[in-house]
Amino acid sequence: MSTPTPLSYKDAGVDIDAGNALVSNIKAAVKRTRRPEVMGNLGGFGALCEIPTKYKQPVLVSGTDGVGTKLRLAIDYKKHDTVGIDLVAMCVNDLIVQGAEPLFFLDYYATGKLDVETATSVVNGIGEGCFQSGCALIGGETAEMPGMYEGEDYDLAGFCVGVVEKADIIDGSKVAAGDALIALASSGPHSNGYSLVRKVLEVSQADPQQDLNGKPLIEHLLEPTKIYVKSLLKLIAASDVHAMAHITGGGFWENIPRVLPDNLKAVIQGDSWQWPAVFSWLMENGNIAEYEMYRTFNCGVGMLVALPADKVDAALSLLAAEGEQAWLIGAIADREGNEEQVEIL
């Protein structure tokens, strides 16, 4: 009887050496995001982080998210260097809504066969997103799982923890009739609505490389999600922010009511901004109703801020100085009976 051929983990489809090569490749990206509160180095069983000493009654705020089917487009068009920014943005933009400063971030990268070059590009993007938001990339998990993913497919998830002073939590309880609403421009569809985006591409049979306002359509669609953390932390410190809404899945209709008391509504001036070209293209080529657009996409508005009307001019000046495109988009009003909490005029 012949002796069976010895098997290794690599024979089963898991390449430990590839995983080690990835860790080596991303060390510089991780180091760039390090905060003084981080203890120890990459590779420990658990990652350690102190709470900044400036907080008297610190409250930890956590969030987790993914990139959705935007990943499908990124994989199909081999654009891997910005989906990591998307991943971080989706988490940290949720934290800043409650006034929280992001402290640290962890990622989960899963694939059937680890491609070190692709994974390095993705994680370097995560590092860039963390750098943009002042957040430490403190650890993560790379899962190589043969038989679970087809071909070059991979999936991403992110987890973030931030901190806010207990007395400074922004929860919408201070919102009042007469408050102004300021919009911060998005960079594109961000990371929401991509199943509909892909359906529009399929039904319209459009060429993703076609020109749209001077650059290929696919570049508009894969533009990374804008991170608002640093500019909004400065606004929070300088003004009296009553509420913020991150316009993600569910669009205007679902995200704005999350931060409003039941007796109030947001009145949006629909003519106060022009939709970026990519949204008009999607609406036209998908024959999408306006209501559905506002329910699915941010339509050019990535973040809304509610604050007293007499603070608007100073807030707009500060945001402009921070490089944000911001404008007065509406106001808070009393809600009568069963009125919708969001009204777009």
From Swiss-Prot:
Pathway: Purine metabolism; IMP biosynthesis via de novo pathway; 5-amino-1-(5-phospho-D-ribosyl)imidazole from N(2)-formyl-N(1)-(5-phospho-D-ribosyl)glycinamide: step 2/2. Its main location: cytoplasm. It is found in: Cytoplasm. Its EC number is 6.3.3.1. The keyword Zinc does not apply. Transmembrane segments: none annotated. The keyword Ribosomal protein does not apply. GO terms for biological process: 'de novo' IMP biosynthetic process; adenine biosynthetic process. InterPro entries: PurM-like_C_dom, PurM-like_C_sf, PurM-like_N, PurM-like_N_sf, PurM_cligase. One of its GO terms (cellular component) is cytosol. Keywords: ATP-binding, Cytoplasm, Ligase, Nucleotide-binding, Purine biosynthesis. It is an enzyme of class 6 (ligase). It catalyses: 2-formamido-N(1)-(5-O-phospho-beta-D-ribosyl)acetamidine + ATP = 5-amino-1-(5-phospho-beta-D-ribosyl)imidazole + ADP + phosphate + H(+). GO terms for molecular function: ATP binding; phosphoribosylamine-glycine ligase activity; phosphoribosylformylglycinamidine cyclo-ligase activity. Belongs to the AIR synthase family. This is Phosphoribosylformylglycinamidine cyclo-ligase. It comes from Shewanella baltica (strain OS185).
